[in-house]
Design a protein with these regions (language model features):
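Long, acidic/serine-threonine-rich intrinsically disordered regions with weak helical/coil propensity
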Residues: 2-168, 296-526
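Core register positions within helices of long alpha-helical scaffolds
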Residues: 106-109, 180, 211, 242, ...
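Alpha-solenoid HEAT/Armadillo-like helical repeat scaffolds in large eukaryotic proteins
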Residues: 164-166, 180, 192-200, 211, ...
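Surface-exposed, low-hydrophobicity interaction/linker segments
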Residues: 166-170, 174, 179-184, 190
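Short inter-helical turns and helix N-cap capping residues of alpha-solenoid HEAT/ARM repeat scaffolds
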Residues: 169-170, 185, 200-204, 216-217, ...
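Conserved hydrophobic register position within alpha-solenoid helical repeats
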Residues: 177, 208-209, 238-243
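A short structural micro-motif
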Residues: 214-218, 245-246
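Long alpha-helical HEAT/HEAT-like repeat alpha-solenoid scaffolds in very large eukaryotic proteins
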Residues: 229-326
């Protein structure tokens, strides 16, 4: 094709016309190709011109025959979502990073209803594919892969890693491949690692030891024990993090012996009946053996003179809970709170409980800290520190039990406690608990000025929008609370309630959009 023929290529003006739209585009210049278009409808005629000019344009670029091969059809992976839901998603996508949580919620609803975005949204989704939440992959991943192939691009990474060869690539790639290998066959993965481990560089050895967390079992203990003597500090740290997860390991038994040497319960019978218990604390000394197991004071403990107390806390945090089997958890925790070494002992035991999530220890932690804050534990004062311990202990409980206990606090109108515990707890609340919490908010906001000031202080209310049940009733309750807020109320509480109401209304609107009877969408703000 010579220069004159290239100049007559009508692809660019036809593409410009398509961008303008059939009704606004100027009439097409007369050519041999436009003469072939027989469609009367302007839109159909423009599409026909695009097809003809596109084929002519590609032919002029001297591409191979495969460039003109028809694309695969878009698969049918499920019905399109209702129009209102599609409109909502487009609005959320245009809002940027601030709407990320709502985009994730939209895709969760789409997955729950078995629907997907319509074809007209695929381009907008493709532009943001790198930042879409994980929930989007299951819903629209296949569609976006199809669009990528249609545009001559590579489909996105699916997150799955080929475990067939973990010996090549960057540190991150090899760690990911080895983790996949471990997930598939833990024993074979470790057996493959052991002969070559010492030959690898330190950063890779560290990464591979971290990867052993997948499928970790007692069979890994000899290898991890050997890693405690590795020349690289990162490898030793990685092994020190994993070994406490193996309660029957030599590491765990060493920690158990140290814990029993540091803590003991002395029991004496009283003359008039009953038994008194006293916690005897023997602070550990620094030693090379402790350092090998990852127990050494940090910089602040050395400067503040709390070296041995820090060692005690670290030992208890790593010890298996069976080291304290001679007495019930409740007794250990109560004595810890009453001890002059309450901070390292309680927090060490708490860390061990949090690591294992042992149900008996978790409930005992929640029970004793509650009693301590209510003044029912002799020798323990009611302080904000104890309240914080209570809130952290409640967070160890299963979601349903956490909600039941906090609901009891709500009924008892313990405002300061409820505000403290709401900073933790489940990521999402049940419908029943959400209703109870909103009723409590309504009650407190109708109370005294001091109550409303207390409610506004910790900025807890502002974060409830993502956690409360996203139903119409929740949104209506939040709006009613905001509407009844006294006019003279400060900006802090009003700002939080406004944000709470806005988030709940949007979340409720997203759910409504997926109902079959919904036919119009509105804006992303509901």
């Amino acid at each position: 094709m010579d220069a004159t023929e290239r100049a007559s290529d009508g692809w660019e003006p036809t593409l410009a016309a398509a961008l303008l739209g059939a009704e606004r585009a100027p009439p097409a210049a007369s050519s041999a190709l436009t003469a072939l278009v027989a469609e009367a409808d302007p839109g159909a005629a423009l599409l026909a011109r695009l097809a003809a000019e596109g084929a002519h344009h590609l032919a002029g670029q001297e591409l191979g025959p495969e460039a003109l091969a028809p694309l695969e059809e878009r698969g049918r992976f499920g019905p399109d979502c209702p129009p209102a839901a599609a409109t909502r998603l487009y609005a959320l996508l245009t809002e940027g990073h601030g709407a990320r949580n709502r985009v994730e919620e939209w895709f969760e609803r789409a997955a729950a209803t078995g629907t997907r975005p319509p074809a007209w949204l695929l381009q907008a989704l493709m532009l943001q594919r790198g930042t879409l939440p994980a929930a989007a992959q299951a819903v629209v991943g296949a569609d976006l892969d199809w669009l990528a192939r249609a545009c001559g691009e590579s489909p996105a990474e699916t997150g799955t890693v080929d475990a067939s060869d973990w010996t090549e690539g960057t540190v991150a790639e090899r760690r990911a491949a080895f983790t996949a290998f471990r997930a598939r066959d833990p024993e074979a993965a470790r057996a493959a690692l052991e002969p070559v481990f010492r030959k690898e560089k330190a950063d890779l050895r560290e990464a591979l030891v971290h990867a052993l967390a997948a499928g970790l079992s007692a069979a890994d203990e000899p290898f991890l024990e050997a890693c405690l003597d590795d020349r690289a500090n990162g490898v030793r740290l990685a092994a020190q993090r994993l070994l406490p997860e193996l309660p029957g390991s030599r590491y765990a038994e060493r920690m158990a012996a140290r814990a029993r040497a540091a803590l003991a319960v002395e029991s004496k019978r009283r003359l008039l009946g009953g038994t008194t218990h006293t916690l005897v604390v023997t602070l550990p000394e620094e030693s090379p053996d402790l350092v090998r197991d990852g127990v050494e004071p940090n910089h602040w403990e050395r400067r503040g003179g709390g070296t041995r107390a820090g060692l005690l806390r670290a030992i208890l945090a790593r010890a298996p809970l069976h080291a304290f089997a001679d007495h019930p958890p409740r007794l250990w925790i109560e004595l810890a709170l009453r001890s002059e070494w309450a901070d390292p002992v309680f927090h060490g035991l708490f860390s061990a409980t949090k690591r294992t999530l042992d149900p008996d220890w978790s409930r005992a932690m929640a029970d004793i800290t509650a009693e301590a804050y209510e003044g029912k534990v002799t020798g323990v004062r009611r302080t904000n520190e104890v309240l914080g311990m209570w809130a952290e202990a409640l967070d160890l409980l299963p979601d349903a039990e956490w909600e039941a206990r906090v609901a009891a606090l709500i009924r008892a109108r313990k405002i300061e406690v409820v505000l403290a515990v709401l900073g933790q707890g489940p990521e999402h609340f049940s419908e029943g608990f959400s209703a109870a919490l909103l009723d409590w908010l309504a009650l407190v906001t109708r109370g005294s000025d001091s109550l409303r000031r207390d409610l506004a202080k910790p900025w807890v209310i502002a974060r409830l929008g993502d956690r409360l049940w996203p139903g119409d009733d929740s949104a209506a309750s939040a709006a009613a609370i905001l509407a009844r807020l006294p006019e003279g109320e400060g900006d802090r509480l009003r700002t939080q309630l406004t944000g709470l109401t806005s988030v709940l209304e949007l979340r409720a609107a997203i759910r409504r959009d997926f109902r079959p009877e919904t036919t119009t969408g509105g804006t992303a703000q509901g």
